[in-house]
A protein has these predicted regions:
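Nucleotide-activated sugar donor-binding and catalytic core shared by glycosyltransferases
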Residues: 3-10, 18-33, 43-50, 103-106, ...
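Short, well-ordered alpha-helical microsegments
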Residues: 15, 40-41, 120-123, 337
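A short acidic, amphipathic alpha-helical/loop segment
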Residues: 20-21, 121-127, 274-278
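Conserved nucleotide-sugar phosphate-binding/catalytic loop shared by glycosyltransferases and other
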Residues: 33-81, 165-166
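Short gly/pro/ser/thr-enriched loop/turn and capping motifs at secondary-structure boundaries
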Residues: 41-42, 58-62, 141-148, 356-358, ...
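Conserved nucleotide-sugar donor-binding subdomain of glycosyltransferases
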Residues: 67-123, 167-204, 208
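Conserved nucleotide-sugar donor-interacting segment of glycosyltransferase catalytic cores
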Residues: 89-169, 215, 220-222
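Donor-nucleotide binding loops and adjacent catalytic segments primarily
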Residues: 217-327
């Protein structure tokens, strides 16, 4: 069996699918190591993989990003994403590259399995495939590839609509400047690592340079882009294995009313007033049941006035709750959206930071939900969107179509096949 090194950016949305992959590969008999932040050591060891920590100077705590990057609190949307790309993703590349190369040499690594948000692999990807070990990429974010209207994480205008818009300018000057600054940051980090500058946008290299790219979604959630044909394979979401779960204490309080799950995820949840509180206030008098999760934060942060139709908890096991849900209200975390769609649950999405605007755009484009186009929607806006999704069957019908498409895919089998093929090619 082979020695396989997994690497993931140290945030839950990036790590969780990689833990499923780690458990899968350990079960296949491979020796599996996983390089990640120290916060995730326990989960990595529980998967059966050997844990290796990021170097301390680039091991950021995702729960306190404003402490690492104080200016983040003053930014939103594209500007916040640009800051994250420069400081959180690009700047650590030289340190990550040194760690990767040392591990590969010391541990005799045969294959590198990376999620597409870990840019520390770019120096290795700059090498010819014949001069490096095989690299398999897992897509845990919206597909990121340049286009005339792309803002870091892909087009916000469905490709089929572009022709009807004629020669209208796609991006404003400020956005173009941000993109140029981010690309320069990646080139500077690569130069520090001793690698040449990128010959294409950094997002494109992460798609074209790996030996294989597996996207954890279905084609129905992504725009049709002929230029990506043959580069990306959609394999469906990589959800945790089905196990018997002990229902949480609040489970017995669920009744027959439509269940509305509301989550700000585990990253953008410092201010619960962005989504949880507006949803709670806007739907307090509705004939629905609210299940509000603070994503690990103290539920007391929502205050003492909790409506009678609401349940507040710091964690919701999606695999248990989503089959009962009428709608998921979220700020657009890619993994949460894929989990909802796998269960045929429609969505209301309110995120604009990180890659969440791209997720929200795809939710609306694919017909599986409503994009609120705001990081801080009003109570009225959230309530109106939830009522529309709950009472208009077309959203659930579209979500069920994507669930059927996902049901025909097998992410685990696809990963096994890709790993076997790449290892055989390397021999």
């Amino acid at each position: 069996m082979a020695t396989i090194l997994l690497v993931a950016t140290a945030t839950p949305g990036h790590v969780n699918p990689m833990l499923v992959a780690a458990r899968l590969l350990v079960g296949e008999g491979h020796r599996v190591l996983m390089l990640c932040g120290a916060l995730f050591e326990k989960g990595i060891r529980q998967s059966g993989a050997e844990f290796v920590s990021f170097s301390s100077e680039v091991d950021f705590d995702y729960r306190a990003l404003e402490q690492h990057f104080p200016e983040r609190a003053e930014l939103s949307g594209t500007a916040q994403m640009a800051l994250a790309l420069r400081r959180f993703f690009a700047a650590p590349i030289p340190v990550h590259d040194r760690k990767l190369r040392a591990l590969i040499a010391e541990e005799g690594v045969d294959l590198l399995l990376v999620e597409n948000g870990f840019y520390g692999v770019l120096p290795l990807l700059q090498q010819a495939r014949s001069q490096r070990l095989p690299i398999l990429m897992l897509g845990v974010n919206p597909i990121s590839f340049s286009s005339p209207d792309a803002i870091f994480y892909g087009p916000r205008i469905a490709p089929e609509l572009r022709h009807s818009l004629g020669d209208l300018p796609w991006l404003d000057e400020q956005t173009r400047r941000l993109q140029a600054e981010v690309q320069q940051s990646f080139d500077a980090a690569l130069a520090e690592a001793g690698a040449p500058p990128l010959a294409a946008p950094f997002t494109d290299v992460m798609v074209t340079a790996p030996d294989a790219f597996l996207q954890l979604s279905c084609a129905g959630f992504e725009y049709e882009r002929p230029e990506l044909e043959g580069l990306i394979r959609h394999i469906g979401p990589l959800l945790p294995p089905g196990i018997a779960l002990t229902p949480p204490p609040w489970w017995e309080r669920l009744d027959g009313r439509p269940l509305v799950i509301v989550s700000q995820g585990t990253l953008a949840n410092v201010d619960l007033g962005q989504l949880l509180i507006p949803a709670m206030q806007g739907l307090a008098g509705d004939e629905v049941q609210l299940l509000l999760t603070t994503g690990g934060r103290d539920p007391a942060l929502l205050g003492p006035s909790i409506p009678a139709n609401a349940i507040v908890t710091d964690h919701v096991p999606f695999e248990l709750a989503l089959p009962r849900a009428a709608v998921l209200v979220t700020n657009g975390g890619y993994g949460s959206v894929q989990a909802a769609l796998a269960h045929g649950v429609p969505l209301v999405v309110a995120g604009t930071g990180e890659d969440k605007a791209e997720v929200a755009t795809r939710v609306a484009w694919s017909g599986v939900g409503i994009n609120l186009h705001s990081n801080e929607p009003t109570a009225e806006a959230v309530a109106a969107a939830v009522r529309k999704v709950v009472h208009k069957p077309r959203y659930r019908a579209r979500a069920r179509l994507l669930a059927d498409e996902m049901g025909r895919l097998d992410a685990r089998a696809a990963i096994r096949e890709a790993v076997t093929r790449l290892l055989a090619r390397a021999c």
